[in-house]
Structure formats: structure tokens, C-alpha cells
């Protein structure tokens, strides 16, 4: 029932009994009489079953009071409370202040030395089974504020991000960049006015301007298409005119060649006339048909309209 004690110099018996099932401890009262079996030790029955709301996964903070020390005045026996490290097993870290009742975690150690002094056995960096850490340098208010900041869904309204790597800081930087973009967009849409702060109004103006520019671009595309068609038609007319010009140029060259082929006498040239006295005894010179002397000028042929005699009665008077 009791753990074996091998060290006789420093006797330590954490005599804690589980009374949650209703079993009575025969040593449930303080045994300080000399006639008892264990003359130098006392026992105390405790309830080791923790309520559901008092169980924590981890703890990290200030432990204000875990066990209270007391002094018994029977024969100079001094009792000091110590932490039952075998009764609790907490892990990881917990931000907050743990309020723990003393009668649920305390064991007792008795000594027969009259000069003994009440002593609270507590390790600085380790309280429960070497797992729970106590930070005595931080205040309760700072721990509570940190706990509320981490557990609550609200963000702290600070001017600058204390932790650039946190999600709240990244979100704040993203929102600031987005607001700057909206301000730039408002300045571009209305250069002469003060930038708007209403994001919905800025988006409405942007949609209106985009639709207007899209309509103007469509009209310009149609106008450009019409101009391209006109350019094509003008190019075709230009090619036709160029062909006609070439034809006219060829006709002009042909006519010039015909004119050059006709011999035209100079105005100072006159045919030599021989007087009849010198040729009276001679016969007239007869030329064959179709032969013309080389120096004799030629008459140009009459046009067909002048050679037409069907309209002579109308054009000429009958007397003639």
C-alpha cells in the first residue's frame, strides 16, 4: 500500500490516496502521536480526479500559488508541502495563468528536527514532471494581453508591422498596395481632380472609360477599313490611267513618225521655170503616171468629209 523507503537519512513519502471511488483511508488523519506505527510521518487523503474543465494540455506563464506551506505544533514536528510531480503530466506550452487548488496536488514530508523551517519545494524552470515551464520575469498583464491577441480573431491596430513574416502583416501590406493602385487608377481616370477614396466609384468610372474607349476603337477600325478600300480603288484607277497614258504616248510617237516621213519644202524654195522661148523648138517633157520629181512638193490628201459630194446641194447654192 505504501511505497518502500530505502533512504533512512532523508525520508520522503508522498502519501496521497485516491478517494474518488469512496474508499476511506485508515490514515486519513494526521498521525502525530508517538504510539502510532509511523511516528514521524503523516498522511493526507486527496481526490486525484481532475474535473474536465481544469485539465490543460500545456502551460507557460506565472504560477501564483501551487501548494501552501503550513506548520504543525505537535512535538515540534514541522510539515512542509511539496508538489506531487507524479500526479500531473502536462506537455508543450500554454500561454496563461493556471489556478490550481492546493489540496489536490500536495504531499507531505515530516521531520523530527525542531530546528526545521517550513520550505516550499519548487524548481525554478520545472514544476510538473519537468514539462511545465514557469516564466517568472513576465508580468501577468503582459501574458494575458498576449494570450488575448493570439486567441481572439481581432488584429491589433499598430502603425507598423512588428513581425513582417506574420499573416496579419502580409495582409496589411497587400491592402496598402491595393489602396495605392486604386489611388493611381483614380488619378489616371480624372487627372485634374482629387483622387477618390470610394473603390466602387473608382471601378464604375474605370468601366465607363473602358467602354467608351472600346467604342471609339471600334469606330476607328471601321473608318480605317473604309479608307483601305478607297485606297485600293484609287490604286486601280491610277493603274488604268497609267495604261491610257502609255497608249496615248505610243499614238503620239506614231503620228510624229508619219509627219517626219512627209517631205515638206522650205518656204524659200521655188521650182525653176524655163521660158517658152528657149524651149519652143523642143517637145514638152512627159512624166510617167505616178512619178513625181524629187524636188516637187506634194499635196496632202483631202479628208473624207471634204470628198463627200452627197451634201453639195445643201451646202452650195443652186446658182453655182
From Swiss-Prot:
Fetch the Gene3D superfamilies from UniProt: Helix-loop-helix DNA-binding domain
Read off the Pfam families from this record: HLH
Indicate whether Transcription appears among the record's keywords.
yes
- According to the entry, every stretch annotated as the bHLH domain falls at 162-213
Instruction: Give the molecular function GO annotations.
Output: DNA-binding transcription factor activity; protein dimerization activity; sequence-specific DNA binding; transcription cis-regulatory region binding
Q: Which UniProt keywords apply?
A: DNA-binding, Nucleus, Transcription, Transcription regulation
Q: Which InterPro entries match?
A: bHLH_dom, HLH_DNA-bd_sf, ILR3-like
| Keyword Oxidoreductase among UniProt keywords | no
Taxonomic path: Eukaryota, Viridiplantae, Streptophyta, Embryophyta, Tracheophyta
Localization annotation? Nucleus
Quaternary state and interactors: Homodimer.
Mind listing the GO biological process terms from this record? cellular response to glucose stimulus; intracellular iron ion homeostasis; positive regulation of seed germination; regulation of DNA-templated transcription
Q: Which organism is it from?
A: Arabidopsis thaliana
Tissue specificity, in the record's words, reads: Expressed constitutively in roots, leaves, stems, and flowers.
Start-end of Basic and acidic residues biased regions? 305-314
Protein name, entry field = Transcription factor bHLH34
- GO cellular component: a single term: nucleus
What PROSITE patterns would the database entry show?
A: BHLH (PS50888)
- Which residue stretches belong to region Disordered? 299-320
